[in-house]
Amino acid sequence: ILKAFPGRTDLSVVVGHDCRNNGRLFAETVANIFSANGIKVYLFESLRPTPEISFAIRQLGAQAGVNVTASHNPKEYNGYKAYWDDGAQVLAPHDHGIIEEVGKVTIDDVKFTPNTDLIEIIGGEMDVDYLMAVKEAMVDQDVINRQKDLNIVYSPLHGTGRVIIPA
């Protein structure tokens, strides 16, 4: 990120996680390393759905984001999904550039002592903004409102959606 945005002093990332093993620990570790290297971090207070991470990146004007999740893989796994400033997962050419930089870094190059002044916890207000944006994106709200017998079933399936829309 530092090399992708040279000369910028206002770099920021959004960091989130899901409900997988050690998700919070890994998200905090990611936040600590970014902050130790001079990058502001918006860290979600608890687990959040992946689309909200993407939304927050754009809403906050962050240059990147990380979601600690293994996505559709078995629950025993965890992973690291990287996002760019458009809120989308990193694609070419950025993915190749990132891997190239990873290959150049040694453990001695990484700063680990967090700068807690650069870590901001986010949550409730972003949830409201996200849910409002989802509602506004509905194709035709009037059609939905006219459905007298409309029933909707929602299940977060024990996932991250349970935080912003409890079942």
Regions of interest found by a model, annotated:
Residues 1:
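Conserved oxyanion/phosphate-binding beta-strand-loop segments in alpha/beta enzyme cores
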Residues 6-85:
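Ferredoxin-reductase
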Residues 4, 78-167:
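Gly/Ser/Thr-enriched, mixed-charge loops and adjacent short helices
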